């Protein structure tokens, strides 16, 4: 049950009954202090301002129409017109029971949507680097979360598998007479790409040969297509090893690269011209958008075809959106691309709406993110100033986690120890990113992310292992816990309410693409359980009924932590 949504609806109805405008909002949120109740509604303030009456007067009218007797033990007006709601302990216990016995922690079923999530998107012939980390793990966390809720999620790995670089690479491989393309690895390709780029910039004959190969590739030349496919396969084979290490759910079947839309591009341009959306201008084809103006106030032109007949990223992205709506039947499309692409995407979406490719009912959302920075506040680099490869970053995470964990677990066998190290290392890297608001830059700090204190993956993983250890000592499993939850202590009450707020939290994350809120929730839950554990004896409770009640709260805490971390793509461990 989404308590926040339930209470908001009731308060909004009472506001309207009290004479407030029909568009009034309860502005309900969990209270930050116990003296203000469990939830506080602030919507009276803005509604009263519109009506030009004292907020407290409107609040009193609202309470006359607000019946929460089935859920709250007390509803009071505080300050100038805030409404504080104190939940009833018996109602809390009943809802905890529903969560305990219900599938998916008793979540309300959603109306399923077809949701396309565009994330990761590495380039061919280059190793993945730290710049790919945020898109990959934030996008995957959202894919997991939305799938868990019951939506049909289509993962789209929009790899850069087309363009001039392939002509350059094919020309260079021919130049050095490289006959062993199947034996190449990605590091070879990176070296070849750098050399090919150098020749392309310095040797006009080579550059023309590369351009000729691009034309041949686009026209379906068998040799060029075979070489192109090998280059893509070599790259993505290596990238999928990184996905496996990161516990990312992308598969080869999710690959929807730029090349997928090639055959659509000529028709897209013709159609946009025919509809009057695009115009020919000095040999090029452009779309002029009134919404975007240049420095002198003229509509900005988005080029979709160059004078030489070539297409641009905008053309491909227009075709991509069209494909996702018409072929994939998307209801919602989420893009996990960095903030620098915001205007580009906005222009593409405006064009697709003008052309009628995207119905108004389809939501197009850019869930942009900031950069990963070093401790110096500059983009994260190697000590020599180079780009940090993703594989090197993960290797270092494992090494650092191993140094922390090996000494603390001397009796673990090597297999279990390595599994623990991997879970902590990869979890720490992912959580450090996911726990930050994606719209901001963040500082990458090894010491902080691997700490067993504070808002980190190791802290939450440890909290989970602590509960599983408790159950082993109890000799019970959850199926044998028959007693209902009895709330007598404030620490029990506080933990129970937070457990009930899981649904409103995961709903917010799914709506806004904000996994950092789930991280904050899990950290709060782990912390609140620790306080509960210290103040409320569990195994040594004063009677069996209280013992089972508290074990039930502990079991729900463990299940919620495990489920929350799983939706973030982070493993739990039974022992730390």
From Swiss-Prot:
It comes from the Bacteria. GO terms for biological process: arginyl-tRNA aminoacylation. PROSITE patterns: AA_TRNA_LIGASE_I. It catalyses: tRNA(Arg) + L-arginine + ATP = L-arginyl-tRNA(Arg) + AMP + diphosphate. It is found in: Cytoplasm. One of its GO terms (cellular component) is cytoplasm. Belongs to the class-I aminoacyl-tRNA synthetase family. NCBIfam families: argS. This is Arginine--tRNA ligase. It comes from Hamiltonella defensa subsp. Acyrthosiphon pisum (strain 5AT).
């Amino acid at each position: 049950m989404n308590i926040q949504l339930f209470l908001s609806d009731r308060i909004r109805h009472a506001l309207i009954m009290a004479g407030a405008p029909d568009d009034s909002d309860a502005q309900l949120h969990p209270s930050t202090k116990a003296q203000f109740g469990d939830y506080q509604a602030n919507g009276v303030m803005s509604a009263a301002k519109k009506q030009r009456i004292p907020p407290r007067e409107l609040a009193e009218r609202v309470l006359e129409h607000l019946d929460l007797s089935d859920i709250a033990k007390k509803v009071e007006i505080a300050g100038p017109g805030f409404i504080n709601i104190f939940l009833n302990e018996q109602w809390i216990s009943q809802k905890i029971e529903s969560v305990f016995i219900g599938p998916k922690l008793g979540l309300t079923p959603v109306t399923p949507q077809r949701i396309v999530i565009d994330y990761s998107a590495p380039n061919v012939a280059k190793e993945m680097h730290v710049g790919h980390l945020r898109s990959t793990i934030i996008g995957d966390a959202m894919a997991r979360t939305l799938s868990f809720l019951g939506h049909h999620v289509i993962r789209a790995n929009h790899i850069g598998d087309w363009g001039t670089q392939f002509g350059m690479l094919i020309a260079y491989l021919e130049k050095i007479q490289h006959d062993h393309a199947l034996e190449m690895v990605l590091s070879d390709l990176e070296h070849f790409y750098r050399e090919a780029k150098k020749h392309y910039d310095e040797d006009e004959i080579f550059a023309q040969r590369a351009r000729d190969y691009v034309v041949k590739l686009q026209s379906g030349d068998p040799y060029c297509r075979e070489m192109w496919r090998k280059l893509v396969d070599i790259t993505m084979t290596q990238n999928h090893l990184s996905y496996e290490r990161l516990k990312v759910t992308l598969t080869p079947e999710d690959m929807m690269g730029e090349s997928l839309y090639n055959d659509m591009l000529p028709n897209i341009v013709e159609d946009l011209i025919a509809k009057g959306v695009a115009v020919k201008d000095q040999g090029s084809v452009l779309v002029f958008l009134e919404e975007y103006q240049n420095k002198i106030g003229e509509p900005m032109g988005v080029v979709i075809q160059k004078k030489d007949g070539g297409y641009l990223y905008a053309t491909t992205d227009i075709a991509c959106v069209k494909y996702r709506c018409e072929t994939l039947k998307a209801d919602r499309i989420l893009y996990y691309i960095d903030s620098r692409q915001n205007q580009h995407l906005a222009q593409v979406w405006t064009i697709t709406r003008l052309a009628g490719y995207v119905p108004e009912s389809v939501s197009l959302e850019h869930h942009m993110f900031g950069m990963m920075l070093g401790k110096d506040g500059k983009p994260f680099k190697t000590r020599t100033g180079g780009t940090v490869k993703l594989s090197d970053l993960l290797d270092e995470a494992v090494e650092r986690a191993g140094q922390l964990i090996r000494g603390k677990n001397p009796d673990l066998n090597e297999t279990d120890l390595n599994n623990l190290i991997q879970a902590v290392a990869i979890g720490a890297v992912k959580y450090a990113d996911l726990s930050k608001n994606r719209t901001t830059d963040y500082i990458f700090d090894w010491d902080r992310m691997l700490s067993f204190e504070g808002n980190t993956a190791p802290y939450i993983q440890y909290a989970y292992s602590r509960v599983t250890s408790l159950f082993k000592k109890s000799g019970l499993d959850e199926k044998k816990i028959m007693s209902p939850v009895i709330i007598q202590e404030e620490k029990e009450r506080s933990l129970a309410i937070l457990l009930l707020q899981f649904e409103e939290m995961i709903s917010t994350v799914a709506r806004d693409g904000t996994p950092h809120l789930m991280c904050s929730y899990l950290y709060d839950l782990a912390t609140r359980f620790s306080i509960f554990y210290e103040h409320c004896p569990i195994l040594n409770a004063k009677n069996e009924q209280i013992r089972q009640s508290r074990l039930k709260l502990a079991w729900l805490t463990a299940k919620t932590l495990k489920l929350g971390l799983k939706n973030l793509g982070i493993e739990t461990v039974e022992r730390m």
